[in-house]
């Protein structure tokens, strides 16, 4: 549980004596040198809890500049590579539901022994994302630069792309009353489908395509980011189903494993529906029961 304010000499219900060492966790096999899982009594609510790393924090050769985003599985930071003098994006493994940041050391630790299994799964999934990105080499896919261990967890650094997400751009356009032109949409769709052509030829499915995971560079080039849900075609039978309402395909929404290129293509269609209308389509599982979503031809856009 997150730490709270208030300091005491000993945690409630304890004698103030040091607790026995915690049992081995097995995480050492994934992250050698990782601090041991804390005993429950060691997690007394003594300090103000801070989830994100502060600006100025050093991670290997990188210095944290600011927080870019925070989700259920981790935090992304804008950082500077002090050796190469360039900005990068760093992703930190920090599954919110089963871990916390030690307020004294900054280390990420499972909440308790019961959360250890979920934390281990999240860590393996995080490293799998890094390995997937390392297999890919395409101008429309974010490049991974390095993977490293710090603060008892895993990080990876990616290229920093100067651009804005389609989510932000779409919202901005609809707020101001502007629209994409037909030629702009055709060009964007063509370039995005070429990225998917390469990705699927590599036998990898993204599984989480949506406006927020597509960046548009200053030159107008789409770049696919966030491969946390991506899986190799041969590993889908062991993949956990992750969904985003409105953008996930019917097979994903129903928790099935028959994921394929068609799944990503459905999400692309949903993405462009959102760009045209200003909102995502109805959830796939709802549409399967009763598809009352009006076609674009009936919507004034």
Predicted regions and their residues:
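Catalytic-loop of the protein kinase fold
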Residues: 200-216
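Activation segment signature within eukaryotic-like protein kinase domains
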Residues: 188-189
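AlphaC helix of the eukaryotic protein kinase fold
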Residues: 103-135
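Activation-segment/catalytic-loop signature of the eukaryotic protein kinase fold
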Residues: 147
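C-terminal lobe helix-coil module of Hanks-type protein kinase domains
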Residues: 246-299
